From Swiss-Prot:
GO biological process: regulation of translational initiation
Organism: Macaca fascicularis (Crab-eating macaque)
Disulfide bonds: none
Record-given protein name: eIF5-mimic protein 1
Annotated keywords: Acetylation, Cytoplasm, Phosphoprotein, Translation regulation
Region (Disordered): 1-22
Modified residues (Phosphoserine): 412, 414
Residues in the signal sequence: none
Domain W2 intervals: 248-415
Principal location: cytoplasm
Gene: BZW2
Function: Translation initiation regulator which represses non-AUG initiated translation and repeat-associated non-AUG (RAN) initiated translation by acting as a competitive inhibitor of eukaryotic translation initiation factor 5 (EIF5) function. Increases the accuracy of translation initiation by impeding EIF5-dependent translation from non-AUG codons by competing with it for interaction with EIF2S2 within the 43S pre-initiation complex (PIC) in an EIF3C-binding dependent manner.
C-alpha cells in the first residue's frame, strides 16, 4: 500500500445526522408549512397525524414547539395574552384545529388522539406540550366561550389518558380567571370530560398526587370559598362525586386539627367538662357527626399515656386510665353506630398492641358499667359487627359476658311478661 494512500472503509456510506438535515426555518416559514399541510389534510385526522409524523423529520419541532401547538389548538400563532397574531390574514391560519372542531366529546377525543400520536412519536415534545397547555389556560380570557369549552374537553380527555399531568390545572388559580368566574366554569367542563374517560377515583387520585386535592376551593373568589358553595356549584353541574370528595377532604383536615387539639388538652389534663364543651363546639362548627368523633377520642385517650411494657400490669393501668375518661366517651357514644365504632376501635387497638390482647374483655365490661356501651351494641358487635383482627381471641374472651347479658335480657323479658 502506498504510504500516502489513506485507508478507505469499503461498503460504508456516511450519512448526515438528521438534526443537521433539518431545514433552517424562521417561525413564519414554519407556520406557513404547517398551515399548508393541515389545510391539505383537511378534516381527515388520520391524514393530519401522518403529516405531522413525517414532517417532524424536516421541521424543527423542538425549536418551534409553541408555534406547533398554538396552530394545532387555535389554528394560528398566538401573541402573549392569547390573541391571534395573524387574525387579519386567513392565508396564515387554518380552520383544521381544535377551536374550529365540532363541540362534542367524540370529535375532541379524535383530536386528542392526534396529540397522543405526535407526542409518542416525538417524546421530546412531552414537556413542551405540558407548558403549552399551562399557557393556554392562562390565556382563557382571550378565547370565546365555545373555544374555552373545547379546550376544557381536550384537557380533560388528555388528563384522562395520561398525556397530561394534573399540575397543568395550577394555571386556573390565577386571580383574574378566578374573579371573573372563568376558572370554576372551565374546571367543571374539564372534570366532566375527564370523568367521561376515567372514574371518579382515578380523577381524585390524580388530584392528590399533584397536591391539588386541598386547593379546589381556590377555583372560587375568597368570599365564596366554602365547602357548601363548592358542593352546590359542582353538584348542580352533575359532578356530585367531586363535591363528596371535597367534603371528605375537608372533614379529614378538620379531624386532624381536632385530634391535635384534643391531644394537647388531654396531655394538659384539662377538666372533662371543658373537653366536652370544646368537642361539641367543633362538631357544630364543622358539621361533624358523633360517629366521626368517637374514634378520635379513643385514639387521643390511648395516646395520652406511657403504657407499661409488662402485660400483667398494663391491664390494671388501662382500666384506671379509661375509668377516668369514661364520662367523656359516654357523652359521644349516644348512638348505636357510635358505640359499634368504639367497640371496633378497642378491638383493633388491643390486637395491634399485643400487651392489651388479654385486656379487651375487661375494657368492654368497664365501658358497659360506665354506660359508655349498651348491651344491644355489645351483642350486635359479638354477633355480626366485629372486625377480623383477633376475632377468635376476642369473641372467646367475650363469650361468658355475652351469655350473662343474654340471660339477664331473658330474665328481664320474663319478669316483664309476669307483671
Amino acid at each position: 500500500m502506498n504510504k500516502h494512500q489513506k485507508p478507505v472503509l469499503t461498503g460504508q456510506r456516511f450519512k448526515t445526522r438528521k438534526r443537521d438535515e433539518k431545514e433552517k426555518f424562521e417561525p413564519t416559514v414554519f407556520r406557513d408549512t404547517l398551515v399548508q399541510g393541515l389545510n391539505e389534510a383537511g378534516d381527515d385526522l388520520e391524514a393530519v397525524a401522518k403529516f405531522l409524523d413525517s414532517t417532524g423529520s424536516r421541521l424543527d419541532y423542538r425549536r418551534y414547539a409553541d408555534t406547533l401547538f398554538d396552530i394545532l389548538v387555535a389554528g394560528s400563532m398566538l401573541a402573549p395574552g392569547g390573541t391571534r397574531i395573524d387574525d387579519g390574514d386567513k392565508t396564515k391560519m387554518t380552520n383544521h384545529c381544535v377551536f374550529s372542531a365540532n363541540e362534542d366529546h367524540e370529535t375532541i377525543r379524535n383530536y386528542a388522539q392526534v396529540f397522543n400520536k405526535l407526542i409518542r412519536r416525538y417524546k421530546y415534545l412531552e414537556k413542551a406540550f405540558e407548558d403549552e397547555m399551562k399557557k393556554l389556560l392562562l390565556f382563557l380570557k382571550a378565547f370565546s366561550e365555545t373555544e374555552q369549552t373545547k379546550l376544557a374537553m381536550l384537557s380533560g380527555i388528555l388528563l384522562g389518558n395520561g398525556t397530561l399531568p394534573a399540575t397543568i390545572l395550577t394555571s386556573l388559580f390565577t386571580d383574574s380567571l378566578v374573579k371573573e368566574g372563568i376558572a370554576a366554569s372551565f374546571a367543571v367542563k374539564l372534570f366532566k370530560a375527564w370523568m367521561a374517560e376515567k372514574d371518579a377515583n382515578s380523577v381524585t387520585s390524580s388530584l392528590r398526587k399533584a397536591n391539588l386535592d386541598k386547593r379546589l376551593l381556590e377555583l372560587f373568589p375568597v368570599n365564596r370559598q366554602s365547602v357548601d358553595h363548592f358542593a352546590k356549584y359542582f353538584t348542580d353541574a352533575g359532578l356530585k362525586e367531586l363535591s363528596d370528595f371535597l367534603r371528605v377532604q375537608q372533614s379529614l383536615g378538620t379531624r386532624k386539627e381536632l385530634q391535635k387539639e384534643l391531644q394537647e388538652r388531654l396531655s394538659q389534663e384539662c377538666p372533662i367538662k371543658e373537653v366536652v364543651l370544646y368537642v361539641k363546639e367543633e362538631m357544630k362548627r364543622n358539621d361533624l357527626p358523633e360517629t366521626a368523633v368517637i374514634g378520635l377520642l379513643w385514639t387521643c385517650i390511648m395516646n395520652a399515656v406511657e403504657w407499661n411494657k409488662k402485660e400483667e400490669l398494663v391491664a390494671e393501668q388501662a382500666l384506671k386510665h379509661l375509668k377516668q375518661y369514661a364520662p367523656l366517651l359516654a357523652v359521644f357514644s349516644s348512638q348505636g353506630q357510635s358505640e359499634l365504632i368504639l367497640l371496633q376501635k378497642v378491638q383493633e387497638y388491643c390486637y395491634d398492641n399485643i400487651h392489651f390482647m388479654k385486656a379487651f374483655q375487661k375494657i368492654v365490661v368497664l365501658f358497659y358499667k360506665a354506660d359508655v356501651l349498651s348491651e344491644e351494641a355489645i351483642l350486635k358487635w359479638y354477633k355480626e359487627a366485629h372486625v377480623a383482627k383477633g376475632k377468635s381471641v376476642f369473641l372467646d374472651q367475650m363469650k361468658k359476658f355475652v351469655e350473662w347479658l343474654q340471660n339477664a335480657e331473658e330474665e328481664s323479658e320474663s319478669e316483664g311478661e309476669g307483671n
